[in-house]
Amino acid sequence: MSQSICSTGLRWLWLVVVVLIIDLGSKYLILQNFALGDTVPLFPSLNLHYARNYGAAFSFLADSGGWQRWFFAGIAIGISVLLAVMMYRSKATQKLNNIAYALIIGGALGNLFDRLWHGFVVDMIDFYVGDWHFATFNLADTAICVGAALIVLEGFLPSKAKKQ
């Protein structure tokens, strides 16, 4: 028996599009208005800083000769497909999980676009305290982390709340 897309978690795919538009739009603005390494202070402890990441989180494997571009692209595609299948198999009313999956897919696809189009991921958010700087990241990374945090949060909810 087939089910309506609107009755499945795929109903939340609109959030993937929103994440992609915001992420790719922010990266476009950085690429059009910043030279590599440019920094603009926004608030105390927060800068816009144009950086290129040829690896993964914290520049993992950034200096590995180029193969990592395709490796991380494959991971992004695989995770996106897996989460889309999970959304299809879940009910649209399971909001927390589906929102989490959509955020992760949107972030993964945003960074995938960068890897395939530019050969690197555009990063621009520089959080710091004093002289200590956290790794520069982007809005796709933020969406992925928020999605992962929602999945962890869902694990702590009582069973009754999960069945909604």
From Swiss-Prot:
Membrane topology field: Multi-pass membrane protein
InterPro entries: Peptidase_A8
Main location: membrane
Pathway terms, separated by semicolons: Protein modification; lipoprotein biosynthesis (signal peptide cleavage)
Keyword terms: Aspartyl protease, Cell inner membrane, Cell membrane, Hydrolase, Membrane, Protease, Transmembrane, Transmembrane helix
Catalytic reactions on record: Release of signal peptides from bacterial membrane prolipoproteins. Hydrolyzes -Xaa-Yaa-Zaa-|-(S,diacylglyceryl)Cys-, in which Xaa is hydrophobic (preferably Leu), and Yaa (Ala or Ser) and Zaa (Gly or Ala) have small, neutral side chains
EC number(s) per entry: 3.4.23.36
Chain's role: This protein specifically catalyzes the removal of signal peptides from prolipoproteins.
Family: Belongs to the peptidase A8 family.
Name of the molecule in the record: Lipoprotein signal peptidase
Gene name of this polypeptide: lspA
